[in-house]
Amino acid sequence: MKRIEPNIIKTSYYTLVSANEGVGRTFWCKRQIAKVLRTTSDRIIVFDVTGEYADFVLDHDRIVPGRIPMILHQYKITDDKPVAAHTIEVDMAMGKQPQLIVHDVSRTMTYTWHKGVLAITASLIHYLAGREHTKTWLFLNLDPYSFEDESESSWTVLERVVKQHGQEVKPVFTSRKLGVKEINRRLNIKS
């Protein structure tokens, strides 16, 4: 693991596998997710571009005791399009909604950033439809400002998700370029 500046790390995929491990943003995000899961019934959706959050689904009884319905989607590239390679459900009774949804797009993003963001965000928009009065925490460990041109698809689709669902979606960004306050200001979200 190589530290490149405060609160930012580069590491191999699937090496930070505990809620009590990690450096900077990764460690902070895992603690925040566990805190929400322990104290509320709010839903959490995580875009995981680093492959570091699967443990919340696979080992959640240790991290967050109790029967909390969780689901993990891991994606791969097929015919130049991202598709779900694996879906892992934990404590998901028939008709029950997951409290934590992790979209592991780490391998997809190594091939195509734009198509990955568009495909995964489309599934997020579908999930949020009809749930306007359900508070959802949206953890994005990806940077919507990775491309300076705001007309880029990665920016447009993320902006649409946040603005369409207003205050019912609480975004938690882990941007390398901009802080949470600055991103929220650009998206017209009151911190």
Q: Would you name each region that the model predicts?
A:
Residues K2-L16, R31-S123:
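Switch/coupling segment of Walker-type NTPase motor domains
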Residues V17-V23, W28-Q32, Y111-S191:
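Conserved P-loop NTPase motor cores
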